[in-house]
Amino acid sequence: MKLRKRLDLLMENKIKELRYAIVQSVPVMLGYLFLGFAFGLMLNDAGYGFWWAFFISLFVYAGSMQFVLVTLLTAGASLWYTLIMTLFVNGRHMFYGLSFVEKFKKIGATYPYMIFSLTDETFSLLCDLKVPEGMREGRVSFYISLLDQCYWILGSCVGALAGSMLPINTTGIDFSMTALFTVIVVNQWMDTKEHKPAVIGGAAGILCLILLGADAFLLPALTITAIILLGVKKKCYIPSES
C-alpha cells in the first residue's frame, strides 16, 4: 500500500511538472510551429517531402541551419562544406553549452539529450526558469527541451504536407528565423536592466560584418563577444535532480 501511494505521488508530481513545462514553453510553441511550418514548406519546395522534414528535425534540429540546409541540399554541397557551414551558422551553441554542461551532468540520464536540444529559444527559457516549490527543476528543464523539439517536428511535418498538397508561394519565408531572433532580443532587452551583453554582441557583430562580410562574420563575432563576457557573472542556473 505504501509503495502504491509513493508511486501515485511520484506520478502526480511528474504530471504537475509536465503541465508547468507546457505552460512555460507556450511562447516557443507558437514560434516553433510557425518556423517549423516554414521550414517544411521550403524543404518540400526544394523537392524533399514529409519524411525528410521529419528525420531532419528529429536528428539535426538546428533551427536556422535547417533553413541553410535546404539550400545546401539543392546545390548538392559536399559533406565538408556542410560541416564548415554548420560551424559558422550554429557555432554559437557551443558557447551556450559552456554555461550548462556541469549542471546538465547532474540531471542524470537525460544529460546527452539536454546538450543536443539546447537551441536559442530553449536556452532562453532555461536561463529564466523558476519552478514552484516541490517541483524538480531538472525534470522541468528536460520536459521543456523535449516539448520544444516536438513543436518543431510537428510544424516541420505539417509544413511539408501542406506544401505537397497546396500551391503556396514560399518567397520570403526564410526571413522568419531572423524575425524570431529579433523578437527574442527585444524581449530580453525589455525584461532586464543589464544591457551590456546585447550591446557588446551587437557591436562585435557590426564590426565583424564590416571587416569580414556577411558570409564569414558570425563565428568571429560570437568568439569576440564570448571572450569579453567571460568574466561576467552568469545568472543561468539549473539544479540537479534530487
Which residues does each predicted region cover?
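Helix-loop interface residues and adjacent transmembrane-helix termini in multi-pass membrane transporters
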Residues: 47, 76, 106, 134, ...
